[in-house]
């Protein structure tokens, strides 16, 4: 038995200890103790405790120190305290103190002694834990510890060495308590003390990394560190801005001092305020009289009308004294001419309309002191370079040192943009890059997901995607590649339960403004837009962005995904891609530094969960007086169907889930269900799974299994089965120690499909002639060939 073996070991140790006690030094020490010659005893202790034991064997100062300070939680300090409690056997008083401590520890009468006992229980070698002072075992352990103290020169190492011995003493104490019937109170106190210590450590680490970053941002962006007027601070606080964001705090002094700057920052980080606040302060400090008909001193050019309107509203919210005008196409010239005659301080607009006003309506730009080009990469990419150059030529001179202050802002900075900077800026211009070449260029507050989906199934599953990731009351922007596609989805997408409206270039400017205003105010939940809404628009609280097609360009994806996750909020961006579009995702990943998380369509369980949550929220909006009229019918329904069934049916009807359509989680095709076959060992080839499946379900099962693929961890496979074949397959299948057959409710991570290719649809590429794993498809147009030639022998062949 373990106890017997332990007793034998202890007996063996006690025999060795007896041999040690036969040496003349301990006898002489014992005789001196009885004679009370304490001076000689101290000298011997100095000789024996070269490694630091003299402090532990001087009982008088230790007993005095042990009562004053609070108990120490560190193990080394606890061991030192326990050693300090061991009295000198030469005086009888310390032994009485031991017994008194033991008695008080059992009766829980003294809080300080209780703490010492519980701490000594952690160290395992406190004298207060000895149940019977007459037993010689503690004295032997004490001498053994003294011997180890001689051999140890480091106090920390001494504690580490004595730790296993302390545990051994604790075990002896436990066995004695079991025989004598003593209560294990010290053990309980040990557990409580450790729990309290762990709780204290958790409290010290309350601030997460994100909270610490926010705290640092608040300190760095405190208004008191910047020359901002009280009126501007008051206006900013009215908008909920209590400190400057990192991009604003890092660029404020540079812009305020009049230097030229090129700024690259992620979307949604507050670029508008980064140039708006310092320029407002510069113009407010200018003593120039605000005469009627004055020429603008600041011009801000944007690529889109919507961005120009947004910047105008932000500037007007910061200052009431300075005049802000916004000029863009699609609006009457008359109002803009009146604004010119009235006088302008900030001029915001698109290049086309401003150029027309300069040429035909005598818009004076000779007084410009500050020029801002926002989203400059898009502005030059869409063909505004000539118009911008024509506008700026009025004020810019060959000598760049005499030109106005020039500020370039963008989320992406191609190499050619720095050539533009050299053309318009002074030689000593500054670069502020908050993105970096190797870091993630997309918004870090956005989760990037990708769902593989055939083109014919996209409209059918779009409603489930919006429902799960945004809900019935969240805001969603769906980006399309064409105006026609945006219009069709907004009018004919039956899967969308939320109200939706389109936004594209064919709409009149007044209609576009009405649509954006309604979306901001929550009049409708889904905005289906082309690239018009991708740049610069700050629409608050957008929960979800959906790209109806795979992103073709990295810069376009950065701006589209940046419509969510703005101003510190989190968001989700989902890209729907077809099997042949996978290479587009890889290009975006390489260029932006993000990683798409491949997921399947939302499962029926997730859709039902989200719909039920929205239905429950909608119940709170029903007035109490209306509920009174339905209580009678509700009671009848409960009596007829039962409360649970009746309420579940009501929630299903409210959420619109009146029918359930089974769909594949692999490609969203209707009428299929996805199965996961888990393996107990890793597999690296689909043939292992096919062999096991055919052994149980027969050779003809390959016509019933479609789109088989390996799981990412190689611990199984995933495939689709027709809904009508599922029941018979379940009845014929029996789980084994190696394979487990389950119906998939949420798509697991899978490996890249071996049958996928990076070319366009309905095309095949030759090679080794590998047969595709979709066993239904026997067409020659989708199978590989021998390679090298056209036609049946392989090579390249167009689908018919």
UniProtKB/Swiss-Prot annotation:
A biological process term (GO) from this entry: transcription by RNA polymerase II
The record's SMART domains line, in alphabetical order, gives:
DEXDc (SM00487), HELICc (SM00490)
Which segment of this protein is annotated as the motif Q motif? 221-249
Q: Any idea which UniProt keywords this protein has?
A: ATP-binding, Cytoplasm, Helicase, Hydrolase, Mitochondrion, Nucleotide-binding, Nucleus, Repeat, RNA-binding, rRNA processing, Transcription
Its recorded reaction(s) are: ATP + H2O = ADP + phosphate + H(+)
Q: Primary place of residence?
A: nucleus
Which part of the chain is the Helicase C-terminal domain? 464-620
Keyword Cell inner membrane on entry: no
Q: What is the tissue specificity? A: Widely expressed. Expressed at higher level in stomach. Expressed at lower level compared to ddx21-a.
Sequence positions that bind ATP: 265-272
Which intervals hold domain Helicase ATP-binding? Answer: 252-431
The UniProt annotation puts motif DEAD box at 374-377
User: Which InterPro entries does the entry mention?
Assistant: DEAD/DEAH_box_helicase_dom, DEAD_box_RNA_helicase, GUCT, Helicase_ATP-bd, Helicase_C-like, P-loop_NTPase, RBD_domain_sf
GO CC annotations on file:
cytosol; mitochondrion; nucleolus; nucleoplasm
Compositionally biased intervals (Polar residues): 114-124
* Positions with biased composition (Basic residues): 789-800
Q: Which Gene3D superfamilies match?
A: 3.30.70.2280, P-loop containing nucleotide triphosphate hydrolases (3.40.50.300)
Q: Where is the composition biased (Basic and acidic residues)?
A: 1-14, 752-761
Q: Which domain of life is it from?
A: Eukaryota
Localization per record: Nucleus, Nucleolus; Nucleus, Nucleoplasm; Cytoplasm, Cytosol; Mitochondrion
Q: Which family does it belong to?
A: Belongs to the DEAD box helicase family. DDX21/DDX50 subfamily.
Q: Tell me, in a sentence or two, what this protein's role is.
A: RNA helicase that acts as a sensor of the transcriptional status of both RNA polymerase (Pol) I and II: promotes ribosomal RNA (rRNA) processing and transcription from polymerase II (Pol II). Binds various RNAs, such as rRNAs, snoRNAs, 7SK and, at lower extent, mRNAs. In the nucleolus, localizes to rDNA locus, where it directly binds rRNAs and snoRNAs, and promotes rRNA transcription, processing and modification. Required for rRNA 2'-O-methylation, possibly by promoting the recruitment of late-acting snoRNAs SNORD56 and SNORD58 with pre-ribosomal complexes.
The protein's name: Nucleolar RNA helicase 2-B
